Amino acid sequence: MGTARIAPGLALLLCCPVLSSAYALVDADDVMTKEEQIFLLHRAQAQCEKRLKEVLQRPASIMESDKGWTSASTSGKPRKDKASGKLYPESEEDKEAPTGSRYRGRPCLPEWDHILCWPLGAPGEVVAVPCPDYIYDFNHKGHAYRRCDRNGSWELVPGHNRTWANYSECVKFLTNETREREVFDRLGMIYTVGYSVSLASLTVAVLILAYFRRLHCTRNYIHMHLFLSFMLRAVSIFVKDAVLYSGATLDEAERLTEEELRAIAQAPPPPATAAAGYAGCRVAVTFFLYFLATNYYWILVEGLYLHSLIFMAFFSEKKYLWGFTVFGWGLPAVFVAVWVSVRATLANTGCWDLSSGNKKWIIQVPILASIVLNFILFINIVRVLATKLRETNAGRCDTRQQYRKLLKSTLVLMPLFGVHYIVFMATPYTEVSGTLWQVQMHYEMLFNSFQGFFVAIIYCFCNGEVQAEIKKSWSRWTLALDFKRKARSGSSSYSYGPMVSHTSVTNVGPRVGLGLPLSPRLLPTATTNGHPQLPGHAKPGTPALETLETTPPAMAAPKDDGFLNGSCSGLDEEASGPERPPALLQEEWETVM
């Protein structure tokens, strides 16, 4: 129960630095919501208007000098646009000017076009301005272009009363290219299929472990909690996607044009009452983050439980089960609640599904800590497995066979410990691009979505005791079905030694055992001291006849395959480690080896 006492202190330690450093509304390195983008555009507009006032207050002689526009202008010769490849011809006035000359006169005035702040433009030249970095989805390595004619006016679009501007280099990331669409469609298909398969297999696994009473023990209870966390994670992802993208597809939500950017920039900041429309979306995102965190922490619980069984001399499984339950479900609730409070107070914008600046570390730091701690436990357990393998197989098998056994045990433990999270843990997907980004996203989508399926296969469907219980249940069901079929036929055969009696069902008295029809195959042919050996009777020191009529299900112990896939009998004892019976301790190693 020590984990329950540590949880409040750990949450306070995590939230205090975040509360003291939550000074920014948005983080420029993260994906931004529409409201956050509006905030940045309005801030850029205010800065631009301030600069415009300073420029317009200059004397006209200074504005008409060469220094007013040399920094942002290019030559007046015809220019080929980089993005479209089109050639923009010179005006008639431009053609009259000698090559390499510079026009003097009234420049094009600086202005804000609701996207970026244009500087002074030299007459007859093309003005190039870097794409603004405050628009997240822009290509920040490109440029936007305008043309200032010889009369000192920004060139207009032919046939339209609006200024011509070329943003093609900036918005190339916003266009729906076929290759990018295929990548996102493939990623969506991978995680949808993966989580669906995991959800179905985990549901069956939980029902199996809950149905058979002989499978009820601390180890399987922890497995059931882990399975449930995987299931809730998958369900929360599907619910979140349905809520976020209801009414508009993902492609429509990501497709932006220059006109839409202008409309966003011209829109006033959303009022505080607009947040009420995001209530359902925010609830879905909050539950998704909570179940995501609980999944990581129940993976950590599995590692702590196995590590405790191996290294603790006295370990009460039943007593510590409650502590593990509080740790797995309660601790994530603490730091998720802290994140909700901070987000609602300091960054209550949008659906909470995207950027929230430094406040994201309230959730990410505990999750990253659980991944690192679980990886350390995994390395230590594999080390003990290797030592145990060398000791038990010294002189009995070659080195290659030992390595194969160690590799098998390591692969069995990897899905349980979530080792695949370590690969890209130090590389956020927002910091990479190109081929590396595609490799990372395909890797994470594949293993994260199918992890629940792998865990269900290894720790339930391949479990020897689970298979034995299913086979016994199937045998009982088929025997009962066969008996009902014979009972409906109207007659049954009963055999007592050499005599066979054919009677009607209506004349049958009390039946033996379960009332199943007996045949000569079920009776022994040998006698003991002149008396027939009846079913269920065994002389002391001789094996009893194993039949369904004489052996209760609770007494028919199947073969124990060990700790991870073995029998629950004896695993809930108070003693463990060196105090545990040698036979049981040996069984616990058999599965992973």
Swiss-Prot record:
Q: Which domain of life is it from?
A: Eukaryota
Principal location: membrane
Keyword Membrane recorded: yes
Q: Which UniProt keywords apply?
A: Cell membrane, Disease variant, Disulfide bond, Dwarfism, G-protein coupled receptor, Glycoprotein, Membrane, Phosphoprotein, Receptor, Signal, Transducer, Transmembrane, Transmembrane helix
* Compartments in which it is found: Cell membrane
Q: List the molecular function annotations (GO) for this entry.
A: G protein-coupled peptide receptor activity; parathyroid hormone receptor activity; peptide hormone binding; protein homodimerization activity
Q: What S-S linkages are listed for this chain?
A: C48-C117, C108-C148, C131-C170
Specify the effect of T410P.
In MCDJ; constitutively activated
Q: How is it modified after translation?
A: N-glycosylated.
Q: Where is the composition biased (Low complexity)?
A: 540-554
Instruction: Give the consequence of mutating I135K.
Output: Abolishes hormone binding and homodimerization
Q: Name one GO biological process term.
A: in utero embryonic development
**How the protein sits in the membrane?**
Multi-pass membrane protein
Q: Where is this region: Disordered?
A: 66-102, 524-593
* Gene3D superfamilies assigned to the protein according to its UniProt record, in alphabetical order: GPCR, family 2, extracellular hormone receptor domain (4.10.1240.10), Rhodopsin 7-helix transmembrane proteins (1.20.1070.10)
Name the reported effect of D137A.
Answer: Abolishes parathyroid hormone (PTH) and parathyroid hormone-related peptide (PTHLH) hormone-binding. No effect on homodimerization
Q: Please list the residue ranges that the record places on the Extracellular side of the membrane.
A: 27-186, 242-282, 343-357, 427-434
What residue stretch is flagged as signal peptide?
A: 1-26
Read off the PANTHER family from this record: PARATHYROID HORMONE_PARATHYROID HORMONE-RELATED PEPTIDE RECEPTOR, PDF RECEPTOR-LIKE PROTEIN-RELATED
UniProt family annotation: Belongs to the G-protein coupled receptor 2 family.
Q: How does it assemble?
A: Homodimer in the absence of bound ligand. Peptide hormone binding leads to dissociation of the homodimer.
**Could you tell me what this protein does?**
G-protein-coupled receptor for parathyroid hormone (PTH) and for parathyroid hormone-related peptide (PTHLH). Ligand binding causes a conformation change that triggers signaling via guanine nucleotide-binding proteins (G proteins) and modulates the activity of downstream effectors, such as adenylate cyclase (cAMP). PTH1R is coupled to G(s) G alpha proteins and mediates activation of adenylate cyclase activity. PTHLH dissociates from PTH1R more rapidly than PTH; as consequence, the cAMP response induced by PTHLH decays faster than the response induced by PTH.
Supply the name of the protein: Parathyroid hormone/parathyroid hormone-related peptide receptor
Q: Could you tell me which species this protein originates from?
A: Homo sapiens
